[in-house]
């Protein structure tokens, strides 16, 4: 039986999953992420009609990292015909780590999907070709989607990622060798790392992504963000490829389209109802939030929600 939502449900869920804190590992590949306190835990919901619910550290901002890959795809969809995007990046899950080069080499420089690093870099390469100021444009889009004017990039995180960018640079140069990367590699990498370094809270993320629960429309915006078809396509990609190589396990446990980031955030969508954002910085071996997945599993079981 599906239950109605209230803050007490979210508080109870956080109490249930809090014992998991200490069992995961905060991302440490760059110092700026490694310094985050691992005990943080938050959850927020925004419904399609504008109701908000939250518990824990739901208002504390953190580095959204790969969650931004959904946002860059949204911007690309608004500036490119569908066929131009999907001839350069695929729609299939990779089954490989998010920063793998092996599969990319075997498949002639065409990334499996836009939510692995290679695919997101292709999307950023496309934005560089269509936008005069890609970083500023992304800020404008995110601020509009969220309705919050002071969202910005964490310059320390972006700089730290650029200083440790050898593997992502290798991915970009490999794609360039296959003719699937057209612009200056360092410039596109800087844009990509700034997108990953967006700082947002669970509440801001839930509000930002609620359009995906409502066929591309958000209750607080006059114009659709994307078309209903594009919203379905993005949700489908999130369901198959949004949780790195553990998308199948996540579908089994949670049953919602979702996108994670190594900052410990996860955004999940209940179509026609709500967007959910959780944050717990400690990660499982696949790079997904350990307590965050458990919280989403508890929530879908409690509310009786699943797309399957």
Curated annotation (Swiss-Prot):
Record Gene3D superfamilies: DD-peptidase/beta-lactamase superfamily (3.40.710.10)
Query: What Enzyme Commission number does this protein have?
Result: 3.5.1.2
Keywords of the record, alphabetical order, are: Hydrolase
Record the organism: Salmonella typhimurium (strain LT2 / SGSC1412 / ATCC 700720)
Q: What is the name attached to this protein's record?
A: Glutaminase
Entry binding sites for substrate:
66, 117, 161, 168, 192, 244, 262
Mention one GO molecular function.
Answer: glutaminase activity
The signal peptide, as residue positions, is none
Which InterPro entries does this entry report, sorted A to Z? Beta-lactam/transpept-like, Glutaminase
């Amino acid at each position: 039986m599906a239950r109605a939502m209230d803050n007490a449900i979210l508080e109870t869920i956080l109490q249930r999953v809090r014992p998991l804190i200490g069992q995961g590992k905060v991302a440490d590949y760059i110092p700026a992420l490694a310094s985050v306190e691992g005990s943080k835990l938050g959850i927020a919901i925004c419904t399609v009609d504008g109701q908000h619910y939250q518990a824990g550290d739901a208002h504390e901002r953190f580095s959204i990292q790969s969650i931004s890959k959904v946002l860059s795809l949204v911007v690309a969809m608004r500036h490119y015909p569908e066929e131009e995007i999907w001839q350069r990046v695929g729609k299939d899950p990779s089954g490989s780590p998010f920063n793998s080069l092996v599969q990319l080499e075997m498949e002639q420089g065409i990334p499996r999907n836009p939510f692995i690093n290679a695919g997101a870099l292709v999307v950023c390469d496309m934005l560089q070709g269509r936008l005069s100021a890609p970083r500023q444009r992304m800020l404008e889009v995110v601020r509009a989607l969220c309705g919050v004017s002071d969202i910005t990039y964490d310059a320390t995180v972006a700089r730290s990622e650029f200083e440790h960018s050898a593997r992502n640079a290798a991915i970009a140069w490999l794609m360039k060798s296959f003719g699937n990367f057209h612009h200056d590699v360092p410039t596109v990498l800087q844009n990509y790392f700034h997108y990953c370094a967006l700082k947002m809270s669970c509440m801001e993320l839930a509000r930002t992504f609620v359009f995906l629960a409502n066929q591309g429309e958000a209750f607080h915006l006059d114009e659709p963000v994307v078309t209903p078809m594009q919203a379905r396509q993005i949700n489908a990609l999130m369901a198959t490829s949004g949780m790195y190589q553990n998308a199948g396990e996540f579908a089994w446990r949670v049953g919602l389209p979702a996108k994670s980031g190594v900052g410990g955030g996860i955004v999940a969508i209940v179509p026609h109802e709500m967007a959910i954002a959780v944050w717990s910085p400690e990660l499982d071996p696949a790079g997904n939030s350990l307590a965050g997945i458990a919280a989403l599993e508890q929530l879908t079981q409690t509310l009786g929600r699943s797309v399957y």
